[in-house]
């Protein structure tokens, strides 16, 4: 389910059972409270009796390994980024979703929900991940090639129309297009009827290829303005007027990231994260991260160059279509003290359901 990072394997050999237990307690305390854990409180948590002085000696060794640090003099210890990565790889036990959690995810993301619009499904999936994780939920989808079931052109203004494409699973995609000057409502209907009669049952790229093959038929059945309208509709649906990048990123739960902020440094890091999420390059990067290995990927702090300055963690998994092509990704972004063991199965199950929905 989770792709581990091989870079921390060597650290495990440097820890004995006692050191490992102390390290684990420090990290778990940080993930729960965000506060440093001191030697006196730590000694009370251990299953075996160990004096605070002995605990401090072990903590010193863990600091030498780069796994923990002291935020200021005479404070307790917090895990470093390396420490968090090592904890995730060596100590984290991925939990199981409860029946209630699985049911909650299925209510939002389920193959039986095909009658809802793609936009609504993506938004609800993102909102659901946010609510269950207390981080920011994200869903990315690439431009897909739905099989056409029905087309309609609806005039909005003298020079604009809504081009409506209904896919084979009744998913609806709407685009506003510029109309050829002088086109009539009757010509809008003729253009839609031509597409439905000659081109239904194909994907948009196939439609454009087929249109070239039936140009003689087009000339015989449609006038020049209607031909122009058909070509404009296919062009905007296929994304030829864009740059071919992922179609949309939906992020919900940004307010969750405001909780627990302390001082201007935290606020500035959050601002940088929000700025990163608005950049189109970020969509490509997140998809590339999801594609870089099977299963759920976990990126902590600067391991993910996209969010390295904001000090955020990303848990992400791809979802696939019927041809096993990656067509999007789902995930959670939040502070480095995310509840990784709980969020990983949540993201994994959501990605599985999104894959079923995409088939």
Swiss-Prot record:
Q: Which SUPFAM superfamilies match?
A: GAF domain-like, Winged helix' DNA-binding domain
Q: Which Gene3D superfamilies match?
A: 3.30.450.40, Heat-inducible transcription repressor hrca homolog, domain 3, Winged helix-like DNA-binding domain superfamily/Winged helix DNA-binding domain
UniProt keywords (A-Z) are: Repressor, Stress response, Transcription, Transcription regulation
Answer yes or no on keyword Transcription regulation: yes
Question: Which terms in the Gene Ontology molecular function aspect does this entry carry?
Answer: DNA binding
The answer to keyword Transcription regulation applying to this record is yes
**What domain of life does the native source organism fall in?**
Bacteria
Gene Ontology biological process: negative regulation of DNA-templated transcription
Name the Pfam families on file: HrcA (PF01628)
Q: Which family does it belong to?
A: Belongs to the HrcA family.
Extract the HAMAP family matched here. Answer: HrcA
Q: What does this protein do?
A: Negative regulator of class I heat shock genes (grpE-dnaK-dnaJ and groELS operons). Prevents heat-shock induction of these operons.
- Record's protein name: Heat-inducible transcription repressor HrcA
> What species is given as this protein's source?
Rhizobium meliloti (strain 1021)
Its encoding gene is what? hrcA
């Amino acid at each position: 389910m989770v792709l581990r990072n091989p870079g921390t394997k060597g650290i495990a050999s440097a820890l004995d059972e006692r050191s490992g237990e102390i390290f684990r307690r420090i990290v778990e305390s940080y993930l729960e409270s965000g506060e440093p854990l001191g030697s006196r409180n730590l000694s009370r948590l251990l299953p075996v009796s160990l004096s605070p002085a002995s605990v401090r000696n072990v903590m010193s060794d863990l600091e030498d390994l780069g796994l923990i640090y002291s935020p200021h003099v005479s404070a307790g210890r917090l895990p470093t980024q390396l420490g968090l990565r090592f904890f995730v790889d060596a100590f984290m036990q991925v939990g199981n979703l409860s029946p209630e959690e699985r049911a909650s995810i299925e209510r939002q993301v389920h193959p039986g929900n095909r009658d809802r619009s793609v936009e609504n499904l993506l938004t609800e999936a993102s909102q659901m991940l946010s609510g269950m994780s207390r981080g920011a939920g994200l869903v990315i989808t690439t431009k897909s090639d739905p099989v056409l079931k029905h087309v309609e052109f609806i005039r909005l203004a003298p020079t604009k129309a809504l081009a409506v494409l209904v896919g084979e699973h009744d998913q609806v995609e709407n685009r506003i297009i510029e109309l050829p000057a002088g086109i009539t409502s009757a010509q809008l209907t003729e253009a839609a009827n031509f597409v439905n009669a000659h081109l239904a049952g194909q994907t948009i790229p196939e439609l454009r290829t087929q249109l070239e093959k039936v140009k003689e038929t087009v000339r015989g059945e449609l006038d020049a303005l209607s031909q122009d309208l058909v070509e404009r509709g296919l062009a905007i649906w296929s994304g030829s007027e864009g740059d071919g990048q992922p179609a949309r990123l939906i992020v919900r739960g940004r307010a969750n990231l405001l909780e627990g902020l302390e001082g201007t440094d935290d606020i500035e890091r959050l601002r940088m994260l929000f700025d990163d999420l608005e950049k189109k390059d970020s969509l490509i990067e997140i998809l590339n991260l999801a594609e870089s290995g099977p299963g759920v990927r976990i990126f902590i702090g600067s391991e993910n160059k996209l969010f390295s300055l904001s000090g955020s963690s990303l848990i992400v998994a791809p979802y696939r279509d019927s041809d096993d092509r990656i067509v999007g990704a789902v995930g959670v972004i939040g502070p480095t003290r995310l509840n990784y063991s709980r969020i990983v199965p949540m993201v994994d199950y959501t990605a599985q359901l999104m894959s079923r929905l995409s088939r």
